[in-house]
């Protein structure tokens, strides 16, 4: 593969084929391409607009080069991030609820644009985020939950970390996280930072052997189910791609004030989650339940979103014990108790 020819093709706004993109991504991730050319390629892709084939090719490369574990029938609740609003880590909270009834392989990272990434909030709760593969399988067996820290499970990505940081712009790598779960989770609730990317990412997901994925973008511009209004969805399954629009009031609840969901730090997010689990923060609890409801539908545990919401109400009642179990087997209960004390006021 001639990297300069690939660059010229991208500059001329021609899309790469899947095999070309996969080969290119492997070369970049392995550190075989000079940084100046990596920068040029990532910018050219962004300016052209990443195609479905390019996303699929890059995702396949990242999956192949990742440290892998086998978690049958797992669900993930990862999102692209990048919405910039800094809301509570609802996908992580939902993952904890889902682990009451299904294996969860939560793939995530530290915050990039927000105040708290999934790794940050789990650490604040006392969780040990570095989990080797054998230990990960053990934790899933015992608790139905494991966190797969992206930096640990995609070690080759360190070869592009400097370029990405220097560029300081969104690149194709920013949208690959939810598509590259090291456990190859077959079910997913995938938050998308932009409504415009729903179509592209749903078509990409369709090519990547998921059983069922629900991609969501919610008003007022978040990569979650909307707490205030409409959620735009793409439901991807073996049968194809279905487009759905759903309003928060369709759950049978009122809209949730967005300002009640904003956090300033990982600890702040952890406290809000625990308060919701304890029944002390109704707004955050509702936000968790509506996102969990859609994830339950992705798992085919319920027949519609409203039924999912009713199921989520039951799950959140059992969330504190589940959180204690998760931290006790892989973390620091002292840190969790500190958060519990701060949450009890």
UniProtKB/Swiss-Prot annotation:
Cofactor note as given? Binds 2 magnesium ions per monomer.
Q: What GO terms describe the biological role, i.e. biological process, of this protein?
A: L-tryptophan biosynthetic process
Which positions in this protein are listed as binding anthranilate 1? 79, 109
State which pathway it belongs to.
Amino-acid biosynthesis; L-tryptophan biosynthesis; L-tryptophan from chorismate: step 2/5
Keyword Metal-binding among UniProt keywords:
yes
The record's GO CC annotations read:
cytosol
Which residues of this UniProt protein bind 5-phospho-alpha-D-ribose 1-diphosphate? Answer: 79, 82-83, 87, 89-92, 106-114, 118
Q: Which InterPro entries does the UniProt entry name for this protein?
A: Anthranilate_Pribosyl_Tfrase, Glycosyl_Trfase_fam3, Glycosyl_Trfase_fam3_N_dom, Glycosyl_Trfase_fam3_N_dom_sf, Nuc_phospho_transferase
Q: Which residues bind anthranilate 2?
A: 164
Broad class of enzyme this protein falls into? transferase
Family matches, as SUPFAM superfamilies: Nucleoside phosphorylase/phosphoribosyltransferase catalytic domain, Nucleoside phosphorylase/phosphoribosyltransferase N-terminal domain
Q: Name one GO molecular function term.
A: anthranilate phosphoribosyltransferase activity
Question: Which cofactor does the UniProt annotation name?
Answer: Mg(2+)
- Cite the EC number: 2.4.2.18
Which domain of life does the UniProt lineage start with? Archaea
Q: Which residues bind Mg(2+) 2?
A: 223-224
Q: Note the Pfam families from the entry.
A: Glycos_trans_3N, Glycos_transf_3
Quaternary structure annotation from Swiss-Prot or TrEMBL: Homodimer.
As for what it does, the entry says: Catalyzes the transfer of the phosphoribosyl group of 5-phosphorylribose-1-pyrophosphate (PRPP) to anthranilate to yield N-(5'-phosphoribosyl)-anthranilate (PRA).
Looking up NCBIfam families in the UniProt record yields:
trpD
What HAMAP family does the entry give? Answer: TrpD
Q: What is this protein called?
A: Anthranilate phosphoribosyltransferase
- Native organism is Saccharolobus islandicus (strain M.14.25 / Kamchatka #1)
Tell me the gene name.
trpD
